[in-house]
């Protein structure tokens, strides 16, 4: 007979990853993000980069360009609960922010719809991160938990298998 499994959610602190220790020391996942995103450097310190993911912001670099210095840029992912709906005014601000702050190497704006029903801004330079996040929040769109080791969009109810409609 199989023995039942009892998970242990009490991981000893000495077994935490450096990312988890960084979060615990970050004052509620805030850390130095405000200062880091306002600094003149194009990238972020490791601690801020790790925390930025929980705020829906990835630090990336142009892999088509070799050598140093790296061409740093950011990806910002909006979490769209349940995949939508998105109001006309929200689409308008997404489009306006994309036009103003995203430009790929060919000079095109870069916004993408993902297979997880999210929206991503690509090729964002550091000075554009705060205005994009702020502009989205003013219209009820948020990047919080858009990246990193967070629960992302729920595309279907976890209890849907109890639904006669779902099981039809």
Show the residue positions of the predicted features.
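Short glycine-/aliphatic-rich beta-strand segments at the starts of folded cytosolic domains
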Residues: 27, 31-84, 152-163, 168
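Residue-identity detector for glutamine
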Residues: 14, 18-24, 47-49, 53, ...
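Intrinsically disordered, low-structural-confidence terminal and linker regions
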Residues: 1-29
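Small-residue-enriched alpha-helical segments and adjacent helix-cap loops
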Residues: 70-168
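Amphipathic, alpha-helical segments enriched in basic
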Residues: 4, 8, 12, 53-55, ...
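Charged/polar, solvent-exposed surface patches and flexible loops
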Residues: 7, 31, 35, 39, ...
């Amino acid at each position: 007979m199989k023995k039942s499994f009892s998970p242990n959610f009490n991981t000893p602190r000495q077994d935490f990853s450096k990312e988890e220790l960084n979060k615990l020391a970050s004052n509620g996942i805030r850390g130095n993000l405000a200062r880091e995103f306002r600094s003149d450097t194009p990238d972020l310190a490791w601690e801020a980069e790790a925390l930025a993911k929980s705020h829906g912001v990835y630090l990336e670099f142009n892999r088509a360009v070799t050598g140093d210095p790296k061409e740093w840029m950011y990806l910002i992912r909006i979490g769209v609960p349940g995949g939508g709906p998105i109001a006309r005014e929200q689409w308008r601000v997404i489009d306006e922010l994309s036009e103003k702050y995203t430009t790929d190497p060919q000079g095109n704006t870069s916004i993408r719809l993902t297979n997880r029903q999210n929206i991503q801004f690509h090729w964002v330079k550091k000075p554009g991160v705060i205005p994009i996040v702020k502009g989205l929040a003013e219209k009820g769109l948020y990047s919080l938990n858009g990246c990193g080791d967070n629960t992302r969009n729920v595309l279907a109810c976890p209890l849907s298998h109890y639904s006669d409609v779902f099981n039809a």
